[in-house]
Regions:
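Short glycine/serine- and small hydrophobic-enriched flexible loop segments
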Residues: 23, 142-149, 232-238
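Acidic/His- and Gly-rich active-site-bordering loop/insert found
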Residues: 2-125, 154
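The feature captures the short pre-catalytic strand/loop hairpin that immediately precedes
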Residues: 119, 207-213
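Acidic/histidine-rich catalytic neighborhood of metal-dependent amide-processing enzymes
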Residues: 125, 131-205
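Acidic-enriched catalytic cores of C-N bond-cleaving enzymes acting on peptides and small amides
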Residues: 199, 217-267
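Short, solvent-exposed loop/turn segments at the edges of secondary structure
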Residues: 78, 113, 201-205, 257
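Short Gly/Pro-enriched turn/cap motifs at secondary-structure boundaries
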Residues: 70-76, 196-200, 253-256
C-alpha cells in the first residue's frame, strides 16, 4: 500500500515536479558556479525538514586521497549539499547521489530555446542540465517529498547528496565520502533508460607536452612546429584508443565499443 500511495502522489503532483525542475534549470550552474543552485537546494531541503549540511570541500583534505583529481578551478563558494531524512531506527540506510553542475551552454546559435529558460515545447523541457542531471537531482528531492506527503516514516536514514564538480573531477562526491557519509546502499541518480547501470568507466585526465623550435616566418622550415608534433600525438592517441578497444572489454558491457574511450579534449599551441 505504501508504494501505491507514493506512486499515486507522484502522478497527481506531476506539475509540481515539472515546476521544481524548471526552477533548478533557471539557476545556471556551469562547473565553477555551483554556489547559487546549492543555496537553493539547501533552502529547499531545510524547508522540507531535513538535516542539511552545506560545506565547501577542502582541497587540503582531498589531496590526501588517492582518488583525488586536481581541480581546474578554485573551490571557494562551491559547496556540496547533503540532506538527511532521519529514520525511526532499526532499518537499513539508503543514499541518493547526484551532481548539480552542468557543462557550458556553448554558442546560443545552437539552441532553439534559451539554455536557462526551461521552456516546454512538444512535450519536452529545454535547458542546460535537464538530462545531465538536474532531472535526476529533482527526482531525488521529489521522492522525499512524496514519502513525507504520504506520512511514511522510514526505519533507516535516507541521505541525499547534491555534489559539485562532477563534470571535471568527481571531487564533490569524494568530499562527501571523506566527510563520512555512507549508507547500506546507494544509487547515483543519473538519467538512464530505467535500467540498472552497475559499472562506470572511471576517468583519467592527462597532459601531453611536446616542444618545438621557434623560427620566424621566413625561416619557419628551420624550426620545429609544435602544431605538427601535436597532430602526431593526436594520431597516436587515436590509434591507442583503437588498440584498447580491440583488447579490453567489460563483462557488463561486452558489445559497447566506447566502453574504454580515449580522446583529446583540448589542444593548445603557440606563444
Amino acid at each position: 500500500m505504501k508504494k501505491e500511495a507514493v506512486m499515486s502522489w507522484l502522478r497527481s503532483h506531476e506539475q509540481e515536479q515539472i515546476e521544481f525542475l524548471q526552477q533548478m534549470i533557471r539557476i545556471p550552474s556551469v562547473t565553477g558556479n555551483e554556489g547559487p543552485i546549492q543555496e537553493f537546494m539547501a533552502k529547499t531541503l531545510t524547508e522540507m525538514g531535513l538535516a542539511v549540511d552545506l560545506f565547501v570541500p577542502s582541497l587540503e583534505e582531498l589531496q590526501k586521497h588517492p582518488a583525488y583529481v586536481a581541480p581546474a578551478q578554485p573551490y571557494e563558494g562551491r559547496p556540496d549539499v547533503v540532506g538527511t531524512l532521519k529514520g525511526a531506527g532499526g532499518g537499513r540506510s539508503l543514499l541518493f547521489n547526484g551532481h548539480i553542475d552542468v557543462i557550458p551552454e556553448g554558442s546560443l546559435d545552437n539552441w532553439q530555446h534559451d539554455p536557462w529558460s526551461a521552456d516546454i515545447a512538444d512535450g519536452k523541457m529545454y535547458g542546460r542540465g535537464t538530462s545531465d542531471m538536474k532531472s535526476g537531482a529533482a527526482a531525488m528531492t521529489m521522492a522525499i517529498r512524496a514519502i513525507q506527503a504520504c506520512g511514511i516514516r522510514l526505519k533507516g536514514d535516507l541521505i541525499v547528496e547534491y555534489v559539485m564538480d562532477e563534470e571535471l573531477t568527481g571531487n564533490g562526491t569524494l568530499a562527501c565520502v571523506m566527510k563520512g557519509y555512507k549508507a547500506d546502499a546507494g544509487i547515483c541518480c543519473e538519467t538512464s533508460s530505467m535500467c540498472v547501470q552497475p559499472g562506470s568507466i572511471g576517468r583519467i585526465w592527462f597532459t601531453i607536452n611536446v616542444k618545438g623550435k621557434a623560427a620566424g616566418i621566413q625561416k619557419h622550415r628551420e624550426g620545429v612546429s609544435g602544431i605538427d608534433l601535436g597532430y602526431l600525438v593526436c594520431k597516436a592517441v587515436e590509434e591507442y584508443e583503437a588498440l584498447r578497444m580491440s583488447k579490453i572489454s567489460h563483462p557488463l558491457y561486452p558489445d559497447i565499443l566506447s566502453s574504454i574511450p580515449c580522446a583529446i579534449g583540448q589542444f593548445d599551441s603557440g606563444t
